[in-house]
Amino acid sequence: MFDTLTHGELLKKTAMEVEADIAGIHKQIEEISERNEWRVLQSYRKHKVSDTHFTPSTGYGYDDIGRDTLESIYADVFGGEAGLVRPQIISGTHAISIALFGVLRPGDELLYITGKPYDTLEEIVGVRGGENAGSLKDFQIGYNAVDLTKDGKIDYDAVAAAINPKTKVIGIQRSKGYANRPSFLISEIKEMIRFVKEINENLIVFVDNCYGEFVEELEPCHVGADLMAGSLIKNPGGGLAKTGGYLVGKAKWIEACSYRMTSPGIGREAGASLYSLQEMYQGFFLAPHVVSQSLKGAVFTARFLEKLGFTSNPKWDAKRTDLIQSVEFSDREKMIAFCQAIQFASPINAHVTPYPAYMPGYEDDVIMAAGTFIQGASIELSADGPIRPPYVAYVQGGLTYSHVKNAICSAVDSLMQKQLI
């Protein structure tokens, strides 16, 4: 690869130095992957998965043994009592919406304790967007968010003060998303849950688990979360699931959410799986390994770009809890050029040049470099971000470590050619 780059010799030398630095961390990632894959394998064996479970269902989808067993496996692996895993859940945002509308009722309040959530959730809660769009606000469900401290930690005093008799759901966003703060480790989420449950044990703790599955050995429900949600075109789909989302948690809350997902009186009993089951099963089995490849790529990205003077978050040697690696460019042109170079190093649509543009759910123009086999799949290598200071690109995913390495080296070579670094 390096002999095709303009600055190949320099980049090869730098890459070799980087891989020597990160070898120990890569070993740790592989060990976590092996333990997570063992847990998945044990669950498949426990549930006696066979090729019968891949049989498509049509129409109403009643008595779909493949779908029902997969939901039991998700619950088993992720530490919940029950789960919903459906191709009809179109995204992580949709899964989160089902969770919130499933358990909140008029007069209740949702309190996010990890700061303002993703931009896409602002229209769900009703702080942005038109009236009568069906937001929580339209149903007289309150919303509040507690800002983090200056160093990105939970402000526990402010959380205690914000909890009131109307508070029913505590929202926790595991990944930083587009925010300039650290993502939260499972150990930190465990402490958050302990804290709010001591105030009121009846509070429902919901965790947005997007980008976090299989990064650590435990998931939020293992440490006391009542409900969590995510997307199948992120970590748990293993790069094979073409669409879908999931919810896992306490059985009574999953049942409540199932009525929001379909209809009261129907719940989880219907919903045809069509031809999605085989790829969902195989993708979930591969997910721990694929996530490890993405993580190894993220560590390489951080160390490589830090050596070139860029600011990365998390740092290359920091403990990780999600796939997202942010890189601060402090310059609009550099950020756009980097994302474009990632697109050019992709297997799909490498001939396409992405430009910043409006995207539904986001306040600023966003650039999205995603030459992926599955549209919008964050488990595949992508680079994106809102065009606003300090011009941070969010790099995530990678089905293979070698693709991430090749793409980052190629992107840096492109920036060098343009004399941007």
Swiss-Prot record:
Protein name (database record): Uncharacterized protein YnbB
Superkingdom to which the source organism belongs: Bacteria
PANTHER family with a match to the protein in the record: CYS OR MET METABOLISM PYRIDOXAL-PHOSPHATE-DEPENDENT ENZYME
The gene coding this protein: ynbB
